[in-house]
């Protein structure tokens, strides 16, 4: 078994070994998934603005941590996008991202309210832990599935960052002075956040990343169609261990035992669902 390198925080684009790129090892479905992921990651500034509204008045350190998180997320999108541009010269990150931003902006990004749409700062951090659980497992799966050396490196670097981001939000969650939420309330927040991604974010990012502007008239956006295509492209990289790690991280954020019956049951159900979705 090959042991993945350990990547430290603070890398930049020049640290990636771009010269090792091997076009013969680019897998089309994985390329399509990476293009879509690049757009989602590149959209971090809007999330930063929203989170800074939610945590207004919480201190300089919190604001600085959110800004650093946003810079790292944006760099993830830039690295994935550059790799995709090398693998497919027809892909242009900035153009695809402009289309994505024009058609996808969650309502709470532009709302004037300062509170969280999750009802509290604790709820917001649970939602963020859910996202970071998903991204850390996803990029770990891409790292393990890819034979292309540069993508393997990029995915490994991003996965390491996402685990650190999970810890940031988990620690922020537990630092809040607000009353704790009940388990079922936390679970509803987690499920709602997953459904938000299932609605349009993943499907529309896949569409904008993989359908060229000149192809739009013949291929109009259909959420169900492109959600299915996005699922086929991305879900095939997972092994059961990636899903179980994801579930354990979510369960931990909910305040339950990450190695208990709930984690085992949820892991089995999620694996079954994803296996069916990628079939």
What are these language model-derived features?
Residues 1-279:
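Non-heme di-metal
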């Amino acid at each position: 078994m090959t042991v993945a390198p350990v990547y430290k925080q603070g890398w930049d684009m020049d640290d990636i070994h771009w010269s090792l790129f091997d076009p013969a090892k680019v897998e089309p479905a994985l390329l399509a998934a990476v293009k879509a992921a690049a757009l989602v990651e590149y959209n971090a500034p809007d999330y930063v603005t929203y989170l800074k509204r939610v945590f207004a008045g919480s201190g300089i350190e919190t604001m600085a941590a959110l800004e650093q998180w946003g810079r790292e997320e944006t760099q993830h999108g830039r690295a994935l996008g550059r790799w995709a541009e090398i693998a497919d010269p027809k892909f242009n990150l900035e153009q695809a991202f402009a289309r994505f931003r024009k058609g996808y902006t969650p309502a709470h990004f532009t709302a004037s309210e300062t509170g969280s749409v999750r009802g509290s700062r604790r709820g917001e951090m649970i939602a963020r832990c859910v996202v970071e659980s998903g991204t850390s497992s996803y990029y770990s799966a891409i790292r393990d599935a890819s034979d292309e050396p540069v993508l393997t490196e990029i995915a490994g670097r991003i996965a390491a960052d996402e685990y650190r981001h999970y810890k940031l939000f988990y620690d922020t969650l537990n630092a809040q002075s607000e009353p704790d939420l009940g388990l079922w309330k936390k679970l509803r927040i987690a499920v709602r956040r997953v459904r938000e991604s299932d609605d349009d974010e993943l499907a529309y990012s896949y569409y904008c990343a993989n359908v060229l502007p000149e192809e739009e008239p013949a291929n109009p956006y259909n959420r169900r169609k492109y959600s299915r295509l996005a699922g086929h492209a991305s879900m095939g990289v997972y092994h059961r261990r990636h899903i179980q790690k994801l579930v354990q991280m979510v369960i931990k954020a909910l305040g339950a035992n990450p190695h208990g019956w709930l984690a085992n049951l949820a892991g089995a159900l999620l694996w079954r669902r994803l296996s069916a979705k990628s079939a």
